[in-house]
Design a protein with these regions (language model features):
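N-terminal pre-catalytic "stem/leader" segment of glycosyltransferase-like enzymes
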Residues: 2-113, 423-518, 522
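Short N-terminal targeting/anchoring amphipathic segment
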Residues: 46-47, 112-126, 508-520, 527-546
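Conserved catalytic-core segment of nucleotide-activated headgroup transferases in glycan assembly
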Residues: 56-64, 68, 76, 205-289, ...
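Membrane-proximal helix-turn-helix segments that form the acceptor-binding/catalytic region
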Residues: 109-111, 159-174, 527-534, 569, ...
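Active-site proximal beta-strand in glycosyltransferases
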Residues: 133-150, 335, 538-540, 553-573, ...
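Catalytic binding pocket for nucleotide-activated donors in carbohydrate/polymer assembly enzymes
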Residues: 163, 288-296, 322-392
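A short, active-site helix/loop in glycosyltransferases that binds the activated sugar's phosphate group
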Residues: 173-197, 587, 593-626, 631-680, ...
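C-terminal amphipathic helix plus adjacent low-complexity
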Residues: 365-440
Length: 758
């Protein structure tokens, strides 16, 4: 066990790291916010690929095409790199180019470019601070057709994919290779159907143009690979390109030794005069593999576009990497080498079944060697690859970049291209704010509401403050899986000083009837950062006590707005704890937002009357209404460990068959010492004492016999709980069946009144 002093030092270091990270985030937000006040520079383009891992993928293809076009000669190009000096091939090529420059990710120059560049092109995501400005055009190209489950299709995927979803909602254009990618990934996996207001350009992936070019001029492609350190000669190229593992580019799992072993073992089994096995790893693990591989002549460098290599590859070996979708257009064979397919399919999930993949599956090195030899022996194009290309690569024809540029940069008529803007549905869209996800009665009611909504009628988005805390994470995991989730990172597009000024002003003065320009700008920027272009028919602040969501909702561009009143709000504001009114300032500010809501929703008729009277000076009577909190009956039974059939059997006087294996103990009912001995054979002394004390306390508070049925309710004795109705109803039950009792656990201002009613 750790000593107290060691634990203290560990906690101290964690606090220092947390504080340092917070200060860095504040500095970034401050700089980015400052640059957002500057004009957007016309005819500028910012490119970022894989968080700055190089000049790569679709952004690289778009960049080179634009650079080659006479009608785009006035464009200024800005490339984002993780470390500018770490990419000498790229920077050296454009050192003297007057229209190309490089910025380091996270730097002040990067934040300036992100805030003031007209065209933003990324194949992954911009950071949490980013929010697209109205003058900007954001093109997210993504980086491949999905094979692995993505977004909400992964276990716990909604919170994990929070920044991807946010980026997509901010985008003006998303790039798609084919209908499968559009429907499977954009519409369903990231749940853009219903709220996305941009366009999906389904005209192929720009990066595949490099593949077509490489196939037309293989000598140039092979020469490029040779110049970057690969030893090819005139041998046929076998490319091993496995996927990366992990949940984010920032935290990949790397097993470099295993990857290198596969290449060396396969090369050893083939004729070295005729075949060469080369390795292409994902950009995010490249440095780690280079460190382990040392000076080798078979690792494809990041500086060579992947599709350039694919164009001269004779046989592709991969696992779950979507790289094979690009390769299908070559008509050459694909092999899948996977040692954990069943486990991976269960844990992560795949969109295609094993039998739907486009090549043989090998689970061992001997099997891979055999399949490799068979594929290399064939002189005919791969029928499976050609069939797959018709579905997944029909538009990877060498002109995908031109078509995208025509739509985005040249303003071509979209009717001549496959451009989807049909993301609306007949469902009404609901945005429900859940608050900070801390366990309490309001949280339980919110989760119950999400489970009881009609998802055939409503498209539901649950919005909350993201947290990794154990209690809050548990509640996040209980959000109905049918709801889309948008977790908010706790930051603003403003400096900490500007945030304090805005919040302090609102806390002191509240919201006026007419909202000022500065208020609207501040909160509209935050709305854009979180939700992008999304619009909702109905906005619900179910939390009811915080200031953030009411202030944010005033800047919402559309939708009716409702806020829940979970208690006698005026009394809550005056409630004292240890001599202080902790809620007074906050609720006074919240009350001033009521004039900007359409509905003020109490949770019972009686509470509605109380709030309508107490808050009359803040809103008109027509805004006050009520909606009784819902119950998730299935969850109650599940947590109680019983089924509806068991409940029905007990009500009918039958003894239900639990279907459980229960060990039964026998004892002498007339001898307590003997009975206790038998009991202690099955339970610890502490458990027996705890149960005895609990029953003794219950017997004192609510006497009853062994045959008495006990009902228990737990909650604050306040109007919204409506204990009076429960007591009156239970009186009728007791009149018909005296052998029942009701135990009410709680305290509050209605205690004396309820005691009188009892």
């Amino acid at each position: 066990m750790l000593g107290s002093s060691l634990r203290g030092r560990i906690r101290g270091r964690e606090r220092v790291r947390h504080f340092a990270a917070q200060r860095r985030a504040e500095l970034i937000s401050t700089r980015y916010a400052r640059w957002r006040t500057q004009p957007v520079r016309p005819r500028t383009v910012l490119y970022e690929a894989f968080s700055g891992n190089g000049m790569l993928d679709n952004p690289e293809a778009i960049f080179r095409y634009l650079l080659s076009q006479p009608d785009m000669a006035d464009l200024e190009h800005i490339w984002v790199l993780d470390e500018v000096e770490a990419h000498p091939e790229v920077t050296g090529e454009f050192t003297d180019h007057p229209k190309v420059r490089f910025v380091q990710i996270g730097s002040s120059a990067y934040l300036k470019a992100l805030a003031t560049t007209t065209y933003l092109i990324n194949n992954a995501t911009f950071p949490q601070e980013f929010a697209k400005r109205p003058e900007q055009v954001y093109v997210n190209t993504w980086h491949g057709v999905p094979l692995k489950h993505m977004g909400f299709d992964m276990p716990g995927g909604g919170p994990i994919a929070r920044n991807i979803t946010r980026n997509f909602l901010n985008a003006d254009y998303l790039v798609s290779a084919d209908p499968f990618m559009t429907d499977t990934m954009y519409r369903k996996a990231y749940r853009l159907q219903g709220i996305f207001r941009g366009a999906v350009i389904e005209e192929g992936q720009p990066r595949t143009d490099r593949q077509v070019q490489s196939m037309k001029d293989p000598a140039a492609a092979r020469a490029l690979l040779e110049s970057r350190g690969l030893s090819l000669g005139d041998r046929k190229i076998i490319l091993y390109a496995p996927t990366w593992r992990g949940e984010s580019f920032q935290d990949p799992n790397v097993n470099a030794a295993q990857l290198l072993r596969v290449v060396r073992d396969l090369q050893a089994a083939l004729d070295p005069e005729r075949y060469v096995v080369v390795l292409k790893v994902h950009q995010v693990i490249y440095d780690a593999v280079v460190e382990r591989a040392g000076d080798c002549d078979f690792l494809v460098p990041n500086s060579v576009p992947t599709n350039t290599t694919l164009g001269v590859t004779d046989l592709l070996i991969t696992d779950y990497s979507s790289i094979f979708f690009d390769f299908l257009a070559t008509g050459r064979p694909v092999l899948h080498y996977v040692t954990d397919l069943d486990e991976y399919s269960i844990d992560r999930g795949l969109y295609l079944n094993q039998e739907d993949l486009f090549g043989p599956i090998s689970t061992s090195m001997p099997a891979l060697v055999e399949h490799t030899r068979e594929a290399l022996a064939s002189t005919e194009p791969s029928a499976r690859s050609l069939a797959g290309a018709e579905v997944f690569a029909a538009k990877d024809d060498g002109a995908a970049t031109e078509r995208l540029v025509n739509v985005v940069f040249r303003g071509a008529d979209e009717s001549g291209y496959t451009v989807h803007r049909d993301f609306g549905t007949a469902k009404e869209t609901l945005l429900v704010y859940l608050g900070g996800m801390k366990s309490n009665g309001i949280m339980t009611s919110a989760l119950n509401l999400l489970r009881n909504l009609d998802y055939d009628r409503y498209d539901v988005t649950a919005f909350y403050v993201f947290s990794r805390g154990r209690d809050r994470a548990k509640n996040i995991g209980q959000v109905d899986p049918r709801a889309r989730v948008i977790p908010r990172a706790n930051m603003y597009n403003a400096s900490p000083r500007r945030v304090r000024e805005e919040v302090n002003r609102l806390m002191v003065h509240g919201l006026p009837e007419t909202l000022g320009e500065n208020h609207v700008k501040f909160w509209s920027d935050e709305w854009q950062r979180i939700f992008g272009h999304a619009r909702f028919d109905h906005l619900i602040d179910f939390s009811g006590y915080g200031c953030f969501s009411p202030f944010l909702f005033t800047a919402a561009p559309s939708g009716t707005k409702s806020i829940w009143l979970h208690n006698d709000m005026m009394s809550d504001m005056q409630r004292e704890t240890i001599g202080e009114k902790h809620l007074e300032d906050r609720l006074q500010a919240v009350f001033t937002t009521y004039q900007h809501f359409d509905h003020l929703v109490s949770v019972s008729p009686e509470l509605n009357r109380v709030n309508a009277k107490g808050l009359a000076s803040y809103a008109g009577q027509e805004k006050f209404t009520y909606a009784i909190n819902t119950i998730d009956g299935d969850r109650v039974l599940r947590m109680a460990g019983v089924t509806p059939d068991e409940i029905a059997a007990k009500a009918a006087g039958d003894v239900p068959e639990h279907g459980r294996s229960v060990e039964r103990a026998t004892f002498d009912a007339g001898n307590i010492a003997s009975a206790m001995t038998s009991l202690l054979e099955h339970f610890d002394v502490a458990e027996v004492i705890r149960e005895a004390r609990s029953r003794s306390r219950l017997a004192r508070l609510a006497p009853g016999g062994r045959s008495t049925t006990t009902f228990v309710t737990v909650g604050r004795l306040s109007p919204e709980k409506n204990h009076a109705r429960l007591i009156r109803a239970f009186a009728q039950v007791h009149e018909q069946n005296p052998d029942v009792r009701l135990v009410i656990l709680g305290g509050g201002k209605l205690e004396e009144e309820l005691n009188g009613l009892v």
